[in-house]
């Protein structure tokens, strides 16, 4: 595709925001002209894979209308194909007649979400009275799915829009399916309004109120072993119009992945620390406070003070802004991924909300070195790419299998609704370049691959992989070959014979799913990318080095030099274990920071087998 713009650090990029080894380095960003997509809905698009390597795309809609079986206005749509592009093609070529269109749905699709929405644990607890102008007390959407490596169960985040109260509120609950989406259950509440969910028909409210936390965006962080959930709240005037998106706050909470999103595992980021909060009384709003996170150009601390409180602050929303007590966060509705080229987290916010609601606005990118103590700095602004979309997500443009996970030097960012060239939906590909990037062929950094238990990855003279424990006479040279695009090849060759190099990846696979399934056997092959750099065998031979971070609740973190190697194609980790049977000693496994102790574990790998040192 033809590149239509270039941004250079020092003009539209501040050098302070870049991951650079010296002050002379610059980051440039080129991006393509927008290309249309057809999967658009009233949410971002979410992508994940199950234990068989099957790819799923899902999105959601919950219109303020009565349910009809003849449309998808109250549906969680699921599709399956080789990857996102396959789903996009299915939708593009499908019939406009809904009875025919439904035939391309995956069985996980929920056609009528109303019974789920109006009978959640939160609805049963707070018992909304209902509002005459609305058909239902709650409109809800499924936002992201994570697959439990112990059971294969699906867990997801539910965005609630509660119209049964006056005024309305947002909230977040947890959903679960134990049969790949055939049946869903809303199991418990994660987040409401920290100031309570008061109905003005029952008790007096102040001049403004907190709308509650919703619109969750999930990031699964393999570095720290935490789920990070970014979510948005609003400050609204109780009387009169304050602008639906005029006074938005951004927050983040986190929970250990091992806790499987259970309510009592979450902590909110507040004043630079991760604090526990009350998860018992939903009507009290899960009372823990959460800071409004902002970029460092607004506050060097990374969050705004003073903290909004409707019980102690007087004035309308605009008056509170004028008093310096409220700010519309520039990070509202952010999507987050790890950029392995920059070695930083990258975020894309919704661009145009604010007190003036001016419509289309340039797209901005922010980066932070840490999520433990986030300091989001603006990396650059695409001044000629203007949209107003809330619904964004990022993907690796080669794999196209996981949303908002790991991206590299080139990545794809999607826009749904109110986009630049194709109003309904589009994407652009962005390519970054660091001026300090080597212009010569990368050298191999020799290393030994040893896991936390002391197992060492080796190979015999016929390039058959073996795993030994303790000292070994390894006659092979092992190393990491930096592709300089955010990805590595794991390579091996007989000592002194680099011309006989082999590459580590999935070699025995008949289909795309086989390359991506849990337990896929890993082997060595010659020149996997020679024929087709976009092929599964090439992508499965590429790895991301993710350093392990011990993240503390006080906002500090420690790196001990250990790391995981994450497969580019599948998002699974390299796992090797000398205690396993021979054909399962070197495999791909889902992320683990804990061991499954049941006899029915779907994935039986151990956490130590994927932590390298």
Locate the predicted segments by residue:
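Bacterial N-terminal signal peptides that target proteins for export
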Residues: 1-9
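Bacterial N-terminal signal peptides
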Residues: 9-18
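Beta-rich carbohydrate-recognition and catalytic domains
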Residues: 25-138, 147-154, 158-203, 222-225, ...
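Beta-propeller and closely related beta-sheet repeat lectin domains
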Residues: 43-46, 139-146, 214-217, 332-335, ...
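Short, flexible beta-strand-to-coil junctions
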Residues: 51-52, 59-66, 161-163, 222, ...
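Sequence contexts marking disulfide-bonded cysteines in secreted/extracellular proteins
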Residues: 116-118, 168, 414-420, 528-532, ...
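Short aromatic loop motif centered on NTY/YTY
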Residues: 201-218, 389-411, 561
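Extracellular glycan-recognition/adhesion modules and their associated mucin-like linkers
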Residues: 438-463, 474-517, 533-581, 600-613
């Amino acid at each position: 595709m033809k590149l239509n713009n270039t941004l250079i650090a020092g003009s539209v990029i501040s050098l302070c925001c870049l991951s650079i080894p010296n002050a002379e380095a610059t980051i440039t960003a080129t991006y393509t002209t927008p290309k249309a997509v057809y999967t658009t809905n009233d949410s971002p698009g979410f992508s994940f894979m199950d234990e068989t390597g099957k790819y799923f795309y899902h999105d959601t809609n919950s219109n303020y209308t009565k349910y009809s079986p003849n449309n998808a206005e109250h549906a969680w749509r699921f599709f399956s194909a080789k990857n996102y592009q396959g789903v996009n093609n299915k939708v593009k070529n499908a019939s406009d007649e809904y009875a025919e269109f439904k035939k391309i749905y995956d069985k996980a699709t929920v056609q009528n979400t109303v019974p789920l929405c109006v009978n959640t644990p939160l609805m049963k607890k707070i018992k909304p009275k209902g509002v005459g102008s609305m058909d239902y007390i709650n409109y809800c959407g499924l936002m992201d799915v994570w697959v439990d490596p112990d059971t294969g169960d699906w867990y997801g985040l539910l965005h609630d829009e509660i119209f049964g109260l006056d005024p309305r509120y947002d909230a977040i609950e947890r959903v679960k399916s134990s049969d790949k989406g055939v049946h869903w259950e809303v199991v418990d509440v994660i987040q409401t309004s920290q100031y309570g969910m008061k109905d003005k028909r029952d008790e007096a409210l102040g001049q403004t109120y907190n709308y509650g936390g919703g619109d969750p965006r999930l990031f699964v962080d393999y570095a720290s072993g935490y789920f990070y959930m970014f979510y948005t709240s609003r400050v609204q005037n109780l009387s009169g119009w304050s602008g639906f998106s005029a006074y938005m706050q951004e927050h983040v909470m986190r929970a250990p992945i091992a806790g499987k999103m259970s309510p009592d595992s979450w902590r909110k980021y507040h004043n630079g620390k991760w604090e526990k909060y009350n998860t018992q009384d939903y009507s009290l709003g899960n009372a823990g406070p959460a800071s409004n996170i902002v970029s460092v150009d607004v506050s060097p601390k990374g969050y705004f003070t003073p903290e909004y409180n409707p019980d102690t602050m007087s004035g309308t929303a605009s008056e509170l802004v004028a008093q310096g007590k409220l700010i519309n966060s520039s990070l509202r509705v952010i999507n987050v991924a790890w950029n392995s080229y920059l070695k930083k987290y990258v975020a894309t916010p919704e661009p145009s909300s604010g007190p003036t609601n001016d419509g289309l606005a340039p797209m901005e990118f922010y980066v932070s070195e840490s999520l433990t103590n986030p300091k989001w700095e603006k990396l650059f602004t695409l001044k000629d790419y203007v949209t107003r979309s809330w619904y964004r997500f990022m993907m690796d443009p080669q794999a196209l299998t996981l949303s908002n996970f790991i991206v590299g030097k080139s990545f794809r960012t999607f826009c749904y609704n109110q986009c630049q060239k194709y109003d309904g939906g589009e994407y652009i590909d962005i390519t970054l370049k660091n001026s300090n990037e080597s212009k010569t062929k990368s050298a191999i950094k020799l290393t030994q691959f040893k896991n936390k238990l002391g197992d060492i990855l080796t190979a015999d003279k016929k390039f058959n992989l073996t795993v030994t424990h303790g000292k070994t006479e390894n006659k092979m040279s092992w190393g990491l070959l930096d592709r300089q695009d955010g990805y590595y090849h794991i390579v091996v060759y007989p000592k002194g014979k680099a011309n006989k190099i082999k590459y580590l990846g999935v070699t025995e696979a008949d289909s795309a799913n086989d390359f991506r399934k849990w337990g896929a056997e890993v082997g060595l092959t010659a020149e996997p990318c020679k024929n087709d750099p976009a092929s599964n065998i090439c992508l499965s031979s590429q790895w991301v080095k993710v350093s392990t971070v011990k993240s503390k609740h006080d906002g500090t973190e420690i790196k001990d030099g250990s790391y995981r190697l994450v497969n580019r194609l599948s998002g699974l980790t390299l796992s090797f274990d000398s205690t396993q049977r021979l054909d399962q000693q070197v495999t791909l496994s889902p992320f683990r920071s804990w061991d499954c102790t049941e006899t029915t574990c779907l994935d039986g790998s151990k956490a130590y087998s994927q932590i390298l040192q």
